Amino acid sequence: MRTQLFSAVIAVIASAATLGLTASPASAQTFRAEIHGGWDHVGDDVNADGLTYGIGAGVDFRLAPRVNAGLEANLDFSTADKCGTSVLAAGDALCIDARRDLSAVARVGYEVSSNGQVYALAGYTNGRFRIDYDPANGPAVRTHENLDGLRLGAGYQHGFGNGLYSKIEYRYSNYELGAERHQVIAGLGIAF
């Protein structure tokens, strides 16, 4: 099931790239780079809240008079960490510490005004987490896990002129092993 999901995500990203590569000269591409940050919530057996911050870069293509498609990559870090007791067994302790998150997504936007667009996104994400587990009656274990997942999201991007823009975005990530992430971020960037 997960293999089919990742195959579908790769197909969507490849299709968006193909659309951009075959765009007519009148629908030139726009490159962009940004910084962003906001709220991060990671949940599974232990829920952790914190801040996320990072950078992103992408390219957008005009598909129709008010419709854009794009590809973007992000590198984010998180301060979300939390410990819980009696999570898997009585007296145990489980701590989760969210680390970096890499993502590659495709997005489709619709211009709601001359300066603003709403958009939806979907793609691949890979989160790194540090997990500490103390079973209370045995040796403690520390491990770092890289978890693959699916990212979905939606947002609004507003241009201020001279290529400057801001955005607000909601992201949902569903990783292997049942881990989930919810993020609300704001970003500032430049398109060129």
Residue ranges and their predicted role:
Residues M1, S15-A17, S27:
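Terminal low-complexity, poorly structured segments
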Residues S7-G20:
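Bacterial N-terminal signal peptides
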Residues T3, T22-F192:
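Gram-negative outer-membrane beta-barrel domains
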